[in-house]
Amino acid sequence: MLMYLLKYYPKILFIIEGTLVTLKYSVIAVILGLVIGMLLAICKVNKNRVLRLFANFYTSIFRGTPLLVQLSIIYFAAPYIINIKFNVFMAGVISFALNSGAYVSEVIRAGINTVDKGQFEAAEALAIPKFLIMKDIILPQAINNIFPSLVNELVNLIKESAIISMLGEMDLMRRAQIVSIETYNYFFPMLIAACCYYILVILISFIAKIIEKKMIVN
């Protein structure tokens, strides 16, 4: 192992640099997914039946089909369906965000349901607009309750983002594949990529625990 590290040090750095690409996809997608998830969750708890049906249908589609299929449709089929050609980055971010939004919506919906309904009724009795009730009273409490689940979604996105290598994006996985081919050694490059993913997950989990403790104190 040590001999390999010394011999292929530049190539190892080449693999590690892919961490930034992986993080870029994951962070942008989880932020967009959080926005989509919030909107869908609000639709799911809305009294309007059409909004509930739409949100549930959306969730069933994106949770019921593989992420790789969704990515392939957006990248390869979109030019024929909507006459728009997405580059690899846009296709990746869109597919990851849409998929993440479906899962996040269920997490947020569950969080909203954990908030005491009496708070909503009391706010309505004070004639507070429903939008402000949801924004200022319900959602902040729901986010506190579901923060660990949202962190898990980010962790899952980091690992699932490896499929973007199928489109040639130079992420961790793609760089490890290139080095594997160049060195005729598949074990060590993949091991290095796995270690990078693992370290990312550990760091994010550690930071999340610190944030969660501060949220509990506040």
Swiss-Prot record:
Q: Which residues cross the membrane?
A: 25-45, 57-79, 86-108, 187-207
Picking any one GO biological process from the record gives: amino acid transport
The reply on keyword Transmembrane helix is: yes
Does the keyword field hold Transport?
yes
Primary location: membrane
Q: Name the source's superkingdom.
A: Bacteria
SUPFAM superfamilies named among the record's database cross-references: MetI-like
Q: How is this protein named in the record? A: Putative glutamine transport system permease protein GlnP
Q: What gene does the UniProt entry assign to this protein?
A: glnP
